[in-house]
């Protein structure tokens, strides 16, 4: 049995939650379905063990989310779940988190997912090895490399990233690489909106196409309409000439 409760606590501290979160009324995690139920105080003094049967997975609900898995350890007194094997956490019709292993705290609404993690929303899929998700803030965070695929056209790699679910926006940091069929963008920080495909970058940024190289330190690029606006030390190098300026509008 894994122990990531301390990781959840660390996540809590790192995101600087206010005490008002804990003053809110807490709802209990509910076990909707389990094929087998085991309660052994000697083997698992604080937990009930829930296991799927041949036909259906374990089903768990809490305040607008549904979780399914092959097996779960339910710590009722702590309002806490450890889920194992083909884990899925669904929030409404817009967000689905899949992993090999997941922890969920019903009091703080914090989620930790690990192993083949996929975060799906209508416009994109994020792939990483571990992910924290704060349901109060509707923010998810990873720090062990991630890959985002949007509409099979835009692919973004980075070492760190944060997803803001309410804005449908990702903030990618460190070794950011946005790839499309027509160009690549390399930047330190890139804000990317999954609905529109618009990307906003800051810091030294290179945009490479088949016939040009663009450099700037601030700006945006619209991946849907293939145009952009570049500010601060902007430069476009074509094969036969170069354009420099404080601000450059670019439309292919």
Model-identified regions with their sequence ranges:
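Serine/threonine-rich, low-complexity intrinsically disordered segments
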Residues: 10, 21-22
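Bacterial N-terminal signal peptides that target proteins for export
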Residues: 1-9
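N-terminal amphipathic/hydrophobic interface segments
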Residues: 22-252
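Bacterial N-terminal signal peptides
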Residues: 9-16
């Amino acid at each position: 049995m894994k122990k990531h409760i301390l990781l959840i606590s660390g996540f809590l501290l790192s995101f600087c939650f206010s005490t008002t979160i804990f003053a809110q009324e807490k709802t209990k995690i509910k076990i909707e379905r389990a094929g087998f139920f085991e309660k052994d105080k000697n083997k698992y003094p604080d937990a009930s063990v829930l296991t799927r049967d041949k036909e259906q997975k374990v089903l768990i609900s809490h305040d607008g989310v549904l979780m399914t898995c092959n097996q779960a350890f339910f710590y009722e007194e702590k309002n806490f779940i450890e889920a194992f094997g083909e884990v899925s956490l669904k929030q409404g019709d817009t967000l689905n988190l899949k992993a090999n292993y997941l922890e969920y705290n019903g009091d703080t609404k914090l989620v930790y997912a690990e192993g083949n993690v996929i975060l799906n929303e209508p416009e994109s899929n994020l792939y990483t090895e571990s992910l924290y998700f704060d349901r109060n803030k509707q923010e998810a965070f990873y720090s062990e490399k991630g890959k985002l695929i949007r509409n099979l056209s835009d692919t973004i790699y980075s070492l760190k990233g944060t997803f803001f679910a309410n804005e449908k926006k990702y903030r990618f940091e460190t070794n950011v690489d946005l790839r499309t069929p027509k160009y690549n963008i390399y930047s330190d920080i890139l804000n990317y909106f999954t609905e529109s495909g618009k990307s906003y970058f800051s810091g030294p940024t290179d945009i490479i196409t088949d016939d040009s190289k663009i450099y700037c330190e601030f700006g945006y690029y619209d991946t849907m309409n293939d145009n952009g606006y570049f500010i601060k030390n902007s430069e476009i190098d074509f094969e036969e000439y170069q354009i420099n300026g404080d601000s450059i509008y670019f439309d292919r």
